[in-house]
Amino acid sequence: RSPVPARGFRLRRGAAGEPDPTPPPALRGVRITAAPYRERPIGILAERSGRRLTAVLACRVSSFSLLDPESQERRLARWGLVLSGASSTAIRRIGWIERTAPAQGDELARWLHAEHDPAVPLRGTPMIESYLELIGTTARVTQEHEILVAVQVDARRVRERGAESVTRALVEETERVAQGLEAAEVTVLGALSPGQLARALRTAFDPYARAELTTLETADPGRDGLAEANAWPVGAVESWDHYRSDGALHATYWIGGWPRVDVSPMFMDALLGRSSVVRTVAVTFEPIPPERSTRDVEAAITRDRADRDLRQRFGQSETARQRQAEDATVRRESELAAGHCEVRLAGFVTVSGRDGEDLRRASSEVLEHAARARLELHRMYGQQAEAFAFTLPLCRGLKS
């Protein structure tokens, strides 16, 4: 339970101060801070006493499935350049998050009320009745898609010391990633402000709170997201196979198997495409410095040669699996020599529902879609609270 409601607000010169934030145990130590940038501040998620800072970009992508194969390959290649370009910088990790959430669903109805001909009654006309029925049907399944790209820097990768230097490095690297995304034909809407970052966290813990937040924002157009204390759930309970936070239940899965055959750039469309459930797909990328990759592959080649010489000395035959492993190592060396970058990655999927039955139905649908994409999902039993944090814009999920 969050102690924030019982703390109250302290009045200072007639103004109410903000209560101190209290993140849940899995996120203890995470704070939302701000960095000045041009006309407005950028929101930053700070961890480990400010030694790790994360900024979040809101993005939009035109329908990838409608592009021709050449355009798809071009965009993927440019995304690869974003990752490879980060391998020798202060960037520690890059997180990609795509989430669906319940849409308001009444935009078309509001438009109809505002734009209809006053001479035509809203009720009783067969055409309008049919249209309202169609709107009512689609509203129940309408989903909003959001794409967030998190950029995390580590103080140990920044040459200059001091909190200001780390913050400056984060802003610079976030700008560079944004430029790379735009080159990949991704529309970057901008970096989230502190209030918008708090709102993004709040709607991750309780996706069904969006309607209430939208109502508040409509009544107060100058409102910029939420205060930091309101980013976290009022109550959260971890169970063996799910995590409850405020008005939502969540089940988080680890992507434990990726396609083992050649696939098209569209292979994840079955999971990321049209969906009637509330879910989040998050992939954390950790670019590996080229010198480290080169050192590892050279050691592997030396080891393979020593093993082959030893087998020849004792007259042992070479198996097909051993030959394949040696060929893979040589191929890896060739790719590094050509300038390609290696990355570590981990993927997680969080499925949300209003109650147990809703969560069960949503989980079944997501598992079916993942199977079509040749992805193996494993439920994170016994660690749902920590696993849920892996699908937040904190670039978590990989062991340091």
Listing of model-derived features with the role each one plays in the protein:
Residues R1-S400:
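Extended, folded cores of ATP/NTP-driven motor/assembly subunits in large transport
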